[in-house]
Amino acid sequence: MTPAFELQGVQFAYKGVPALNGLDLTLPLGRRTALLGANGSGKSTLLRLLDGLQFPAAGRISAFGTPLTEAMFTDEAAAIAFRRRVGFVFQNPEVQLFCPSVFDELAFGPLQLHWPKERIRARVARAIAQFGLGPLAGRPPHRLSGGEKKRVALASVLILDPEVLLLDEPTAALDPQATDDIAALLETEFGARNPGRTLIFSSHDLDLVARIADHVVVLEAGKVAAAGPAAEVLARTALLRRARLLPGFDGTAP
């Protein structure tokens, strides 16, 4: 099966500081992949490259077997086709919530894709019920709590039914109840009810990863330190300590 994404020798730097350093990685379709690693290991950079928001200085990325390049996004039809298949929710959802109400936020994507008005109304109504947004539908997104903003951002992407969802730290800065709400939402949307969907998310929360992921990639200094079934990777405590994900870092090899 063609993977969702394949990266070969990918390099990327911010102001001369390497973020990804010759990264080789295959991300399969139909899996729930968690990206783990210390701050600065390259997780957020990787997600931005997978979404076509940035492009590598060297190396190659393919999406669904097709090269993911700047040139692809100059072709309107190709760009729209990619955006229909891939959705991205930022760590800070405020950067993608800009409509006057939650209802308008949910309708924005379908409007951009020129869905018929009847289809938009029906799908937005279903999303409001599906994601428990009824009491929030008429409110401005910027006045919502952190957990509510995250839920609206997720709903505004999932309403388009993307094949792949990219999430950057989905529960960062949320309280325990909001964290549990987001985890439950992800379990529902990417569980047995939707077996073909692909989730790729970064996190420092090992409890969330154990609950959601079936595949884990650990990044270290812009390279893959480990990848495999979630239970196997999460059992490698020395590796997780080295990645600052468990207390007791001692510098030893996994």
Curated annotation (Swiss-Prot):
What cellular component GO annotations does this protein have?
A: ATP-binding cassette (ABC) transporter complex
Keywords from the named record: ATP-binding, Cell inner membrane, Cell membrane, Ion transport, Membrane, Nickel, Nickel transport, Nucleotide-binding, Translocase, Transport
- The main location is membrane
> What highest taxon heads this organism's lineage?
Bacteria
One Pfam entry name: ABC_tran
Q: How does it sit in the membrane?
A: Peripheral membrane protein
The EC class name is translocase
Gene3D superfamilies under this entry? Answer: P-loop containing nucleotide triphosphate hydrolases
GO BP? nickel cation transport
Residues reported to bind ATP: 37-44
Q: Where is the ABC transporter domain?
A: 5-246
Q: What is its EC number?
A: 7.2.2.11
Q: Name one GO molecular function term.
A: ATP binding
Catalytic reaction annotation: Ni(2+)(out) + ATP + H2O = Ni(2+)(in) + ADP + phosphate + H(+)
PROSITE patterns with a match to the protein in the record: ABC_TRANSPORTER_1, ABC_TRANSPORTER_2
The places in or outside the cell where this protein is found are: Cell inner membrane
The UniProt similarity line reads: Belongs to the ABC transporter superfamily.
Q: What does this protein do?
A: Part of the energy-coupling factor (ECF) transporter complex NikMNQO involved in nickel import. The complex confers nickel uptake upon expression in E.coli. Shows very low activity with cobalt. Presumably responsible for energy coupling to the transport system.
What does the subunit section of this Swiss-Prot or TrEMBL entry state? Forms an energy-coupling factor (ECF) transporter complex composed of an ATP-binding protein (A component, NikO), a transmembrane protein (T component, NikQ) and a fused possible substrate-capture protein (S component, NikMN) of unknown stoichimetry.
Entry protein name:
Nickel import ATP-binding protein NikO
Its source organism is Rhodobacter capsulatus (strain ATCC BAA-309 / NBRC 16581 / SB1003)
What gene is this protein a product of? nikO
